[in-house]
Amino acid sequence: VTTSRREHLVVHALLGSHGTTVTARRHELTIDEAPRYGGHDSGANPVEHMLAGLAAASLVVLRLLGEVALAESATLTVSASVNVGRVMGTDDGAAIEMIRLDWHVANAEHAERLRAALPHLARRRPGQALIDAASISTEGVSIRELTTAGE
């Protein structure tokens, strides 16, 4: 018998003169835009915060899948192409046109384990709908090149 557990998460946002302050539980984040979009660059922009959430959620779920050592040794870069015209109201296309998750692992065995875990990760990752809504999404795995000291 499985029981389903739900949590209700709440964040509070307050627009200030230099960005938006968002409070989640007892944690504060500053969200702002680059000056070219009318901001002061006092924090990452909203899309960067979403990408950070996807990256963190990916590593957390990988750990929850039992791949603790892999999660602790992997690095993940999440990037996206944003349709600024859509955000500004001048275009009807997808807001996020492309999203890419680039995993870097230490060796071939880790790469094989990660590739096997990716379908399970996609089913459980919070924010997967954001990835699925992008016009194009890719998730790749590569092995880090190890360098020796002095190179």
Per-segment meaning from a language model:
Residues 54-58:
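Alpha-helical metal-binding/catalytic segments enriched in His/Glu/Asp
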Residues 1-52, 62-151:
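Extended beta-strand/beta-hairpin segments
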